[in-house]
Amino acid sequence: MVAYLEFEKPIAELQARIAELRSTADAGSLDLESEASKLEAKSDKLLRDTYAKLTPWQKTQVARHPERPHFKDYVAGFITDFMPLAGDRAFADDQAIIGGLGRLGDRKVMVIGHEKGDDTASRIRHNFGMAKPEGYRKAIRLMELADRFGLPVVSLVDTSGAFPGIQAEERGQAEAIARSTEACLALGVPMVAAVVGEGGSGGAIAVAAANSVLMFEHAVYSVISPEGCASILWRTGDKAAEAAEAMKVTAADLQKLGVVDRVVAEPVGGAHRDPAAAIAALGAAIGEELDKLAGKKPTALRAARRDKFLAIG
């Protein structure tokens, strides 16, 4: 059963009424089944209408939905022969960032991304997708490996931001983020990044400075969370909705600003309502972007990437 968000309360109420009618209709009442069908049509229309005009803050809530597909779901959906590669060869293996070798269609790729986890135990293990320095250093190692063997890099971004703990700072969090961003820009192979949920600050761009940046329709991408922005500007997190509006966090706004190259449509009601369709759409979009970049020389790829990010702002 779908977990409904706060703004979806009218839809949830309709669905509860439909379930109630259908459980009663099991006794054989055709009139009740007919009424349930009418309510189902009304619910579907309400869902479409609601998602056609989401505010930036509502999109932020959708991007954070616990049932949205995560890195492991995407890998299982469109990467075959996946072979995970662990560790930064310096300190530890950070499970907030996962990466490895695999195939996207007939193309060999290096795939890297944030994993948030899907239950309490896995969320703790993956630190809710908030990477530490060793996570970004693992990403650097895998990108350098891909460059050495001529493999395109695919990055899936879904993080509220890099982990801000004191131990992470002591181990050089800022330096690791900067080096990872630099590693993206220095690649001589094609790189495609996709923001699939939250794209939070440097923790996101550290693995997203790519030739082509994709973004799901209801994903968000920003320098700070709306709550964080509100607490700084208004001294209260209650202004998060206003902050989300002001920061232009949505895919449509960011495409207009040139930060995002392509917006990938989601199923009606968000990726969490039809994960298989969302995963298939993203896999196809990434494949198309890699096709466009195939055959380009390393110098051209680096120059295009550099020019793209220098032009932002």
From Swiss-Prot:
GO process terms (BP): fatty acid biosynthetic process; malonyl-CoA biosynthetic process
Record EC number: 2.1.3.15
Major localization listed first in the record, in broad terms: cytoplasm
A GO CC term attached to the entry: acetyl-CoA carboxylase complex
Substrates-to-products reaction catalysed: N(6)-carboxybiotinyl-L-lysyl-[protein] + acetyl-CoA = N(6)-biotinyl-L-lysyl-[protein] + malonyl-CoA
SUPFAM superfamilies noted in UniProt: ClpP/crotonase (SSF52096)
Swiss-Prot/TrEMBL keywords: ATP-binding, Cytoplasm, Fatty acid biosynthesis, Fatty acid metabolism, Lipid biosynthesis, Lipid metabolism, Nucleotide-binding, Transferase
Similarity field: Belongs to the AccA family.
Name of this chain's protein: Acetyl-coenzyme A carboxylase carboxyl transferase subunit alpha
Organism, as annotated: Rhizorhabdus wittichii (strain DSM 6014 / CCUG 31198 / JCM 15750 / NBRC 105917 / EY 4224 / RW1) (Sphingomonas wittichii)
Highest classification ranks of the organism: Bacteria, Pseudomonadati, Pseudomonadota, Alphaproteobacteria, Sphingomonadales
